[in-house]
Amino acid sequence: MTPTYMNIMLAFTISLLGMLTYRSHLMASLLCLEGMMMSLFIMTTLIALNTHSPLINIMPIILLVFAACEAAVGLALLVSISNTYGLDYIHNLNLLQC
């Protein structure tokens, strides 16, 4: 395993540990989730470049689309919670039910 892949896996692991550590705050969780998605994007891009397969070249773009959708939904939820309660605690998500 090359050092590049090890660094990307280390970035993913650190983001995952941050997600587990700061799971009570929505903003920190969203930032850690973005770090995980960015490391996955870089990993799939490197794999697509190394395999030279035309079928796998679309995978990084699909992952980037899902990351953008996740960021938009997370930001909308963060704004909604911040405007309503003034805090970004995840335990406030139960209070958003109809």
From Swiss-Prot:
Annotated TM spans: 1-21, 29-49, 61-81
Primary localisation category: mitochondrion
Stored Gene3D superfamilies: 1.10.287.3510
Keyword Mitochondrion recorded: yes
Coiled-coil annotated residue ranges, if any: none
Entry keywords, A to Z: Electron transport, Membrane, Mitochondrion, Mitochondrion inner membrane, NAD, Respiratory chain, Translocase, Transmembrane, Transmembrane helix, Transport, Ubiquinone
Localization terms from the record: Mitochondrion inner membrane
Known catalytic reactions: a ubiquinone + NADH + 5 H(+)(in) = a ubiquinol + NAD(+) + 4 H(+)(out)
GO CC terms in record: mitochondrial inner membrane; respiratory chain complex I
Annotated membrane topology: Multi-pass membrane protein
GO molecular function: NADH dehydrogenase (ubiquinone) activity
EC class (word): translocase
Protein origin, superkingdom: Eukaryota
Assigned EC number: 7.1.1.2
Stored Pfam families: Oxidored_q2
GO biological process: ATP synthesis coupled electron transport
Entry keyword Disulfide bond: no
Stated role: Core subunit of the mitochondrial membrane respiratory chain NADH dehydrogenase (Complex I) which catalyzes electron transfer from NADH through the respiratory chain, using ubiquinone as an electron acceptor. Part of the enzyme membrane arm which is embedded in the lipid bilayer and involved in proton translocation.
Subunit structure, interactors included: Core subunit of respiratory chain NADH dehydrogenase (Complex I) which is composed of 45 different subunits.
Family designation: Belongs to the complex I subunit 4L family.
Name the UniProt record assigns to this protein: NADH-ubiquinone oxidoreductase chain 4L
Organism whose genome encodes this protein: Macaca pagensis
